[in-house]
A protein has these predicted regions:
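Exposed, flexible binding/inhibitory loops of compact, secreted disulfide-stabilized domains
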Residues: 20-160
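Bacterial Sec-dependent N-terminal signal peptides
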Residues: 1-28
Length: 160
């Protein structure tokens, strides 16, 4: 009888140990609290590829700003990019086009298992409600500094 109790106790400990380990391996995908930024005004035109921008240093920020600054508007020669503390933050951006009636939702999640930040933008087009005047946006978002070992991905989906 004592042997059976010991055997059942060991089985219980093994089951608890295994079930606890499974919980630790599940993907944790918290949504971050982020700051969405407006586009940087008429003096900066970011002609972006589908890959998006991941800006994590002031030198890269200034370089990209310089490459995308236009000079054909009044006062653009003296305008500067907003100040961002890249020791604490990373700036993400990807270009989308929407009309004034489209619905847009954005979020940034962290997948701790694959070590990846994912910036998701969902667009629902309501073509029948609006003229087709397109508003182009870079969807800038400021997030806490992305750790070195993490990657960043962008997911943009559009539905009618």
């Amino acid at each position: 009888m004592k042997t059976l109790q010991i055997f059942l106790s060991l089985c219980g400990i093994i089951v608890l140990t295994i079930s606890c380990n499974k919980e630790e391996t599940k993907a944790q995908r918290p949504t971050l609290k982020v700051t969405y930024l407006d586009d940087f005004g008429k003096c900066f035109f970011f002609n972006n590829s589908k890959s998006g921008y991941v800006i994590d240093s002031d030198s890269l920020y200034q370089e990209i700003g310089k490459l995308n600054k236009v000079s054909y508007f009044v006062d653009c020669d003296t305008v500067k990019l907003p100040i961002i503390d890249f020791t604490k933050n990373t700036l993400l951006g990807i270009q989308t086009g929407t009309t004034q009636c489209d619905s847009l939702s954005r979020s940034v999640i962290v997948d701790t298992v694959v070590k990846k930040y994912i910036y998701t933008i969902n667009i629902i087009h309501f073509k029948e409600l609006c003229s087709q005047e397109l508003k182009v946006s870079m969807n800038w978002v400021l997030i806490p500094k992305v750790p070195y070992e993490y990657k960043v991905g962008f997911e943009v989906t559009a539905h009618n």
